[in-house]
C-alpha cells in the first residue's frame, strides 16, 4: 500500500481525483482508513475558491474510519479501532493551550485545512485526536460527531441554561438542526427554528422543534414582539442581516451566540446597539469544535442527537465536485452531503 486515491484541491474549482502517496506517519500519529467524510460549509470556499492555506491540499475534517497503522510511540493495540477524529491540532504550549482553551490556540494546525484532510482513502492524524465509536454507531453517523460538537460548544457558550426558558435558532442547516437538538437535550423545550427553506423547517419540526418559522413569509421581529421575546438566540447561518437582527429577538439580559461565519460586513443600527447596552445583553461568539473533551460521541451514542435524517446525500469519493454541486443547488434541500468509502 504505497498510493491512494484522493480529491486534491489544486486551485479554484480544481478538485482533482488522483493517485497520491499514502501519508508517512510521524511520531504519535496513526493512519486512518477513511469510511465517511462530510462536506462542511467551510469546505465550500476551500474547494470552490481554492481558499486553503497552501496548494495543493486535501480538505475534509468531518470524518470517521478505522485505524490501520500506527507510528512510533503509539500502541499497536489501536489498530482496528473504529473512530471519529477531532480535527483541531493545538500546539499544546501557547498561553491559551496552557489555560485549557485549545480552540484559542495561536499556533494550531487543522486537519483538512492546514494539513491534509479526509477526502482521501487514508489520512494521518495524531493518535490523541481519535474519538472511539461504539460498534452500533455507523461510520456515517460518526462522521457527524465533529459538527455535533460544534453545536454543543455553541450552546455551552451561552452559559448555564435555565429550565423553562426559550431559544431561537436562526438557520436550519446541519449546525442549526444540531443546535436545536442540543438545546432540547439540555432541557430547553421551547426552541424556535427559523429559515427560508420549508423542507428543512419540516425536518426540524419532525425532530422536535417547538415551532418553525419561514422568514420569507413571516416578519420575524414583529412575530416575536407580539408573541414574546426569547432568552437565548443562536445564529448558525452566517448571514449578515440575520446577525444584525438577533438583538431584536431577545429579552433584556438575554444571550446572543454567533456560530455562523459571515463573509460580509455586519452593520448594527444605533438603536440596536443601544438595545445591547440598555438590555445588558450577553453577546458571544463560538469558534468551531474543541479538541478535548469531545462530547459529540456521547450525545450520539445516548440518542440525545439524531443524525440519520440530516445526512441527505451520499457519494463515492470518485464523484468529486458533483457532491459540492449537489450541496449548492437549493432544489436538492441538501443538509449533510457525505463521501462514503468501502
Give residue ranges: language-model regions:
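Short amphipathic alpha-helix with an adjacent loop that forms part of the alpha/beta core around
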Residues: 218-228
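Glycine-rich beta-strand-centered segment in the early N-terminal region that forms part
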Residues: 23-37, 50-95, 134-136
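C-terminal hydrophobic helical "lid"/dimerization subdomain
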Residues: 2-4, 244-248, 290-342
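N-terminal Rossmann-like NAD(P) cofactor-binding module of classical short-chain dehydrogenase/reductase
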Residues: 84, 231-234
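NAD(P)H dinucleotide-binding glycine-rich loop of Rossmann-like/cofactor-binding domains
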Residues: 91-170
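Glycine-rich phosphate-binding loop and adjacent beta-alpha segment
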Residues: 240-302, 340-342
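Residue-level marker of beta-strand positions
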Residues: 62, 81-82, 96, 122, ...
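Mid-domain Rossmann-like dinucleotide-binding core that forms the NAD(H)/NADP(H) cofactor-binding site
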Residues: 137-217
Amino acid at each position: 500500500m504505497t498510493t491512494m486515491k484522493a480529491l486534491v484541491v489544486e486551485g479554484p474549482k480544481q478538485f482533482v481525483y488522483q493517485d497520491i502517496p499514502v501519508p508517512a506517519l510521524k511520531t504519535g500519529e496513526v493512519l486512518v482508513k477513511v469510511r465517511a467524510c462530510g462536506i462542511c460549509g467551510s469546505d465550500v470556499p476551500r474547494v470552490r475558491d481554492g481558499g486553503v492555506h497552501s496548494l495543493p491540499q486535501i480538505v475534509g475534517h468531518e470524518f470517521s474510519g478505522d485505524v490501520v497503522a500506527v507510528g512510533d510511540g503509539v500502541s499497536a493495540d489501536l489498530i482496528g479501532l473504529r473512530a471519529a477524529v477531532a480535527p483541531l491540532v493545538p500546539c499544546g504550549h501557547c498561553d491559551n493551550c496552557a489555560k485549557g482553551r485549545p480552540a484559542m490556540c495561536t499556533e494550531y494546525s487543522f486537519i483538512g485545512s492546514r494539513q491534509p484532510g479526509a477526502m482521501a482513502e487514508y489520512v494521518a492524524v495524531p493518535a490523541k485526536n481519535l474519538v472511539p465509536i461504539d460498534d452500533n454507531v455507523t461510520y456515517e453517523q460518526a462522521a457527524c460527531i465533529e459538527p455535533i460538537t460544534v453545536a454543543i460548544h455553541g450552546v455551552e457558550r451561552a452559559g448555564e441554561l435555565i429550565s423553562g426558558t426559550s431559544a431561537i435558532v436562526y438557520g436550519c442547516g446541519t449546525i442549526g438542526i444540531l443546535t436545536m437538538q442540543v438545546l432540547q437535550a439540555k432541557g430547553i423545550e421551547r426552541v424556535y427554528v427559523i429559515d427560508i427553506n420549508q423542507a428543512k423547517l419540516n425536518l426540524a419540526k419532525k425532530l422536535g422543534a417547538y415551532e418553525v418559522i419561514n422568514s420569507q413569509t413571516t416578519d420575524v421581529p414583529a412575530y416575536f414582539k407580539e408573541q414574546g421575546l426569547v432568552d437565548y438566540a443562536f445564529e448558525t447561518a452566517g448571514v449578515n442581516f440575520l446577525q444584525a437582527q438577533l438583538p431584536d429577538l431577545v429579552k433584556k439580559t438575554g444571550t446572543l451566540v454567533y456560530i455562523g461565519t459571515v463573509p460580509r460586513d455586519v452593520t448594527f443600527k444605533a438603536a440596536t446597539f443601544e438595545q445591547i447596552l440598555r438590555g445588558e445583553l450577553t453577546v458571544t461568539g463560538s469558534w468551531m469544535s474543541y479538541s478535548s473533551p469531545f462530547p459529540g460521541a456521547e450525545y450520539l451514542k445516548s440518542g440525545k442527537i439524531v443524525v440519520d435524517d440530516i445526512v441527505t446525500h451520499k457519494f463515492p469519493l470518485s464523484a468529486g465536485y458533483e457532491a459540492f454541486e449537489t450541496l449548492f443547488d437549493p432544489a436538492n434541500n441538501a443538509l449533510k452531503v457525505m463521501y462514503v468509502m468501502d
